[in-house]
């Protein structure tokens, strides 16, 4: 079971992480401006 979770987590997080990075970057840039 742990092996299955280890292989699934990167697949699930792959599309989510870029979205979070975009949000953080947008907030940082707007705050600096």
Swiss-Prot record:
This protein's UniProt keywords: Toxin
GO terms for MF: toxin activity
Coiled-coil region(s): none
Cyclopeptide (Ile-Pro) cross-link site: 11-18
Protein name: MSDIN-like toxin proprotein 2
Propeptide: 1-10, 19-33
NAD found in the keyword field: no
Modification note: Processed by the macrocyclase-peptidase enzyme POPB to yield a toxic cyclic octapeptide. POPB first removes 10 residues from the N-terminus. Conformational trapping of the remaining peptide forces the enzyme to release this intermediate rather than proceed to macrocyclization. The enzyme rebinds the remaining peptide in a different conformation and catalyzes macrocyclization of the N-terminal 8 residues.
Lineage: Eukaryota, Fungi, Dikarya, Basidiomycota, Agaricomycotina
Highest taxon, organism lineage: Eukaryota
Source organism: Amanita phalloides (Death cap)
InterPro entries membership: Amanitin/phalloidin
Function field: Probable toxin that belongs to the MSDIN-like toxin family responsible for a large number of food poisoning cases and deaths.
Family statement drawn from the similarity comment of this UniProt entry: Belongs to the MSDIN fungal toxin family.
């Amino acid at each position: 079971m742990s092996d299955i979770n280890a292989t699934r987590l990167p697949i699930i997080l792959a599309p989510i992480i870029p979205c979070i990075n975009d949000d953080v970057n947008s907030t940082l840039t707007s705050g600096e401006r």
